[in-house]
Structures are given as structure tokens and as C-alpha cells.
A protein has these predicted regions:
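Exported/extracytosolic protein signature
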Residues: 1-258
Length: 258
């Protein structure tokens, strides 16, 4: 007689995806900044979303991290600076199943599962963080939100930092985002062509405006000068704007009596 017996195995190779982004609420101010542009002292709110794209699989011992933040954009010190959402409380975990008699088929014992609690741990390390999740089933996206504050030491820098994720049964994936910290530092120096004048002389003023912070760009700059001394009047059409090479530059010049 022909005998048959069955055995069940669980092939479990997860496929991870990762997406890193940031939010810039300061765009609402309408100050002409770019989407990825922040000022010194402003908060940068990052999001990292990791998902398991392989149907039927469970990513085991998933590790998500972002350890590439510079000192000037380190994770904030508050306890809620890192939060994790989307982690399931429990999963249905495949098991070997019920022992059955040999030399026969037992389809009623196929695909047995047990309920398994899912653990999630958040750890600070260096300037960043590590999140460990015990199990991540198919199409169960989890999101790590974390908050940093731009410091003076990174002013003028474009900061690219990278988040990554891997599991015991999934290859490592990475994603990066770039922000620019742009807090210009303006300097104004005003001089005259000579130290003394007599009645009827023409006084020639020279105002040099510079932006001193490397890597920064000042936008929509307004330079204003008011003559406070009685008896001194501004000559119409005498205001000329020149660039650093001495070439006359276009500008919106508004001239009043003083």
C-alpha cells in the first residue's frame, strides 16, 4: 500500500521599505524660505515610516535607527522627543502545530497560529535613537516621529542624515533627508568721505551692507537710513546701489525728504 504523510514549514523572508521626511510648519509665515529651510532655534520634526511589503511574512527583531544627526541638530532632551506609532499589541504567530499521526494527511492542522505579544523599545544613542520591535507583520507600517532643534553650530549648513531599518530576516534599507539651516548675519558699516564739512558742502555717505554667515543667504533685505541732523537735506537721485564689484545694481529705492 502507498503511504502519505505531511509536514509544514514556514518560509519567512520579510521585505522592508523605509521613508524619511520632515515637516516645516514655519512655511506658513510666508517669509520666502524654501521647503527644507530652517532658522537657528527652530524645531525640525522628522518622520520615519517602515513597512513590511512581503505578504505572509513577519519581520523578526526589527531595528530602526537614525544615528547620523550632527551635534548641532541632536535629538531634543524631552522624554517625548521620540514617539512610535502603529506597533501592533499582538500578532498571530505561525507555529509548528498539533502533533499528528504518521502515514496520513492532516490538513485540519495546517497554518496554525498562536497569539504573540509584540514588544517595542526606544533607546537614545549618541545624537540619535534606536527603536527595536519584536515582530512586524505584512502591511503594518510603523512611524517614528522625532524632534530636533537647530543650533548655531550648524548655521549655514545643509544637513543630510539617514535613517535605516533591518531585521533578522530582512535586508537593510535606508532613506535620507536634507535640510538647510539659514540664519543670515547682517553687518552695516557707514562712513563719510571726510571728517569735517562747512556750510554748503556736499556730504557723501557710504553704507556697506554684508552678510557674514558662511552658507547663508539673506532675502528681501531692507536697508533704511534717516537723517536726524537739522539743516542737512537728502539730494534727490543721489542714492545708488552697487554690488561688491562696484557695478550699479537694480533695487527698489524709495526716497523721502529726510
Amino acid at each position: 500500500p502507498v503511504s502519505q504523510d505531511d509536514a509544514e514549514v514556514y518560509v519567512n523572508t520579510a521585505v522592508l521599505s523605509i521613508e524619511k521626511s520632515f515637516q516645516n510648519p514655519y512655511l506658513a509665515a510666508g517669509d520666502g524660505r524654501a521647503e527644507n529651510e530652517f532658522r537657528v532655534g527652530e524645531q525640525v520634526n522628522y518622520q520615519v515610516t517602515v513597512n513590511n511589503l512581503q505578504k505572509g511574512s513577519i519581520a523578526r527583531n526589527l531595528v530602526i535607527s537614525d544615528l547620523s544627526l550632527p551635534e548641532g541638530l541632536a535629538l531634543d532632551g524631552a522624554e517625548d522627543a521620540v514617539t512610535v506609532s502603529g506597533v501592533p499589541a499582538v500578532i498571530q504567530n505561525p507555529v509548528a502545530g498539533t502533533d499528528d499521526a504518521g502515514n496520513q494527511l492532516n490538513p485540519e492542522n495546517y497554518k496554525e497560529t498562536v497569539e504573540k505579544p509584540v514588544s517595542c523599545q526606544v533607546t537614545r544613542q549618541g545624537t540619535g535613537w534606536i527603536v527595536t520591535i519584536s515582530d512586524l507583520p505584512y502591511q503594518t507600517p510603523v512611524t517614528v516621529n522625532f524632534r530636533c532643534t537647530a543650533q548655531e553650530s550648524v548655521n549655514g549648513m545643509e544637513i543630510v542624515n539617514t535613517a535605516q531599518a533591518y531585521a533578522d530576516n530582512a535586508q537593510k534599507v535606508k532613506d535620507s533627508s536634507k535640510i538647510w539651516v539659514n540664519s543670515p548675519v547682517l553687518n552695516v558699516e557707514k562712513t563719510t568721505d571726510k571728517p569735517f564739512y562747512k556750510y554748503g558742502d556736499i556730504i557723501t555717505y557710504r553704507i556697506v551692507l554684508t552678510q557674514e554667515q558662511t552658507g547663508c543667504v539673506a532675502r528681501n533685505v531692507t536697508l533704511q537710513d534717516v537723517i536726524d541732523t537739522q539743516g542737512v537735506r537728502l539730494l534727490k537721485d543721489s542714492v545708488i546701489l552697487m554690488d561688491e564689484k562696484g557695478n550699479v545694481a537694480d533695487a527698489d529705492v524709495q526716497i523721502n525728504d529726510d
